[in-house]
UniProtKB/Swiss-Prot annotation:
Residue ranges of every copy of the Radical SAM core domain listed in the record: 73-291
Assigned EC number: 2.8.1.8
Protein name (database record): Lipoyl synthase
Pathway this chain belongs to: Protein modification; protein lipoylation via endogenous pathway; protein N(6)-(lipoyl)lysine from octanoyl-[acyl-carrier-protein]: step 2/2
One GO cellular component, as annotated: cytoplasm
SUPFAM superfamilies: Radical SAM enzymes
Matching CDD domains: Radical_SAM
Binding site for [4Fe-4S] cluster 1: C62, C67, C73, S302
Catalytic activity: [[Fe-S] cluster scaffold protein carrying a second [4Fe-4S](2+) cluster] + N(6)-octanoyl-L-lysyl-[protein] + 2 oxidized [2Fe-2S]-[ferredoxin] + 2 S-adenosyl-L-methionine + 4 H(+) = [[Fe-S] cluster scaffold protein] + N(6)-[(R)-dihydrolipoyl]-L-lysyl-[protein] + 4 Fe(3+) + 2 hydrogen sulfide + 2 5'-deoxyadenosine + 2 L-methionine + 2 reduced [2Fe-2S]-[ferredoxin]
Binding-site residues for [4Fe-4S] cluster 2, renumbered to this chain: C88, C92, C95
GO MF annotation list: 4 iron, 4 sulfur cluster binding; lipoate synthase activity; metal ion binding
InterPro entries: Aldolase_TIM, Elp3/MiaA/NifB-like_rSAM, Lipoyl_synth, rSAM
Chief location: cytoplasm
Length: 315
């Protein structure tokens, strides 16, 4: 019997063996429909970007979360940087990022990130992270340091953050983040509250809504953003309810995308939402008052985030 070592990164079956609602391994997954087409690329830019990231000791959520758009985005020289390591303190059953006891923060990471952004000549960058429940501020100060370093090295750049929930430390985290504010504040609601215990153990639906609204009230000039994965078992009514909840909590921008099971040990895909339904939900979101909406099978919260920020249609 293998002894559990919390300092090592656990994935898949090992990671999900300790969540409160057990998930049976999928033996006959749903067949992917024709509209789920992963964009492959043999572009040398992909390998060059991976080399650059490794040289600067950086991690991307694109790689760690097995994003279906990785080759497309890397081929265009864009990436969503994941700071504070590659070991998350949570065990979300939809997510492919590894779980474990995180390593100490790298004090060189802000500078390495800023230099990499400069080399890539980015004008819009997305910064996200693992959950760091081991830190008193959830890593918010490190976020601010990264944002400030990126801006100092890259004048005129726009910075979007996709943050964890800072559960139990919201005010402290926002106090720290105030020292280096982003241009867009994103926190994903992910799914309907009924599915939280299974999909997001350790998270809390009302808390996530409160984080988004509290940030907006403290910094009203900064757009707030959130996203949902569809196909986890939610109903159409639940999706519409979540969208209304987000608007009631002053969220400005919304992304809707199809959930894709990373491994057979993760939550299974309950259904593949049709492009037509994504279009209908996107139109409803606009009617509800979201200023920017990206809704489509392969949409992810940071997919073409620069175009999303400009209000262009992304699907």
């Amino acid at each position: 019997m293998t002894t559990y070592d919390p300092s090592q990164k656990s994935l898949g079956k090992e990671k999900l063996s300790r969540i409160p609602v057990k998930i049976e391994a999928t033996h006959t997954p749903l067949r992917k429909p024709d509209w789920i087409r992963i964009r492959l690329s043999t572009d040398s830019k992909v390998s060059q970007l991976k080399k650059l990231l490794r040289e600067n000791h950086l991690v991307t959520v694109c790689e760690e979360a097995s994003c279906p758009n990785l080759n497309e985005c890397f081929g265009h020289g864009t990436a969503t940087f994941m700071i504070m390591g590659d070991k998350c303190t949570r065990r979300c059953s939809f997510c492919d990022v590894g779980h474990g006891r995180p390593d100490p923060l790298d004090p060189e990471e802000p500078v390495n990130l800023a230099n990499t952004v400069s080399i890539m000549s980015l004008r819009y960058v997305v910064i996200t992270s693992v959950d760091r429940d081991d830190l008193r501020d959830g890593g918010a100060q490190h976020y601010a340091q990264c944002i400030n370093a990126v801006r100092e090295k890259n004048p005129g750049i726009k910075v979007e953050v996709l943050v964890p929930d800072f559960r139990g430390r919201m005010e402290k985290a926002l106090d720290q983040l105030a020292q280096g504010l982003p241009d867009v504040f994103n926190h994903n609601i992910e799914t309907a509250p009924r599915l939280y215990k299974q999909a997001r153990p350790g998270a809390d639906y009302p808390w996530s809504l409160a984080l988004l609204q509290t940030f907006k009230k403290r910094f009203p000039g900064i757009p707030t953003k959130s996203g949902m994965m569809l196909g986890l078992g939610e109903t159409r009514e639940e999706v519409e309810m979540v969208m209304r909840d987000l608007r009631q909590h002053e969220v400005d921008r919304l992304t809707l995308g199809q959930y894709l099971q990373p491994t057979r040990y993760h939550m299974p895909v309950d259904r593949y939402v049709t492009p037509q339904e994504f279009q209908e939900l996107g139109e409803l979101a606009k009617k509800l008052g979201f200023s920017n909406v990206a809704s489509g099978p392969l949409v992810r919260s940071s997919y073409h985030a620069d175009l999303q920020a400009q209000g262009e249609r992304v699907s």
